[in-house]
Design a protein with these regions (language model features):
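A generic fold-level signal
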Residues: 13, 23, 47, 87, ...
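Terminal output helix/cap of sensory domains in signal transduction proteins
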Residues: 50, 55-84
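Sensory coupling linkers of modular signal transduction proteins
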Residues: 97-127
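Per-ARNT-Sim (PAS) sensory domains and their PAS-associated C-terminal
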Residues: 73-75, 79-93, 98, 103-105
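PAS/PAS-like sensory domain cap-loop motif
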Residues: 35-47
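Polar/charged side chains located within well-ordered beta-strands of beta-rich proteins
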Residues: 21, 66-69, 93-94, 107-111
């Protein structure tokens, strides 16, 4: 298996929002360029070590919609969410990856912006 840093590089130039957190601490370990840009960050160093809920949702406690306890390596959970911080409707795909070198698990979230495609029938769940 590739090293985790090689996996992060794969996401770097994607046109989707991608971030990864340490599943145990909620600390951000990776954000791709698009995600850094939408949150007004200059580099990954500006995000690393910060709690995902503090940076991405501007809250002091883990999000009520956090699905970390339902994620598994190799399987994706797909859901829709309106993010008021960035004012975008997103289709989210979440999974876990495991670092074969040390056994650590990371939550990876890929967000596809569906703001322009969203339908009028309320398929987007707002929290």
């Amino acid at each position: 298996m590739k090293e985790v840093k090689d996996i992060w590089q794969f996401f770097e130039n994607m046109n989707e929002y991608v971030y990864a957190t340490d599943i145990e601490t909620h600390e951000i370990v990776y954000m791709n360029r698009k995600t850094l840009q939408v949150y007004g960050l200059q580099s990954l160093e500006d995000a690393k070590g910060k709690k995902c809920y503090e940076l991405l949702q501007k809250t002091l406690i883990p999000c009520g919609m956090c699905n970390n306890d339902r994620l598994s390596v190799g399987e994706f959970e797909e859901w829709h969410y309106y993010n008021p911080i960035i004012d975008r409707y997103l289709m989210l795909k979440d999974t876990l990856i495991e670092d074969s070198a040390n056994g650590k698990k990371y939550r990876v979230e890929i967000g596809v912006d569906i703001s322009e495609e969203r339908t009028q029938d309320g398929v987007i769940q707002k929290y």
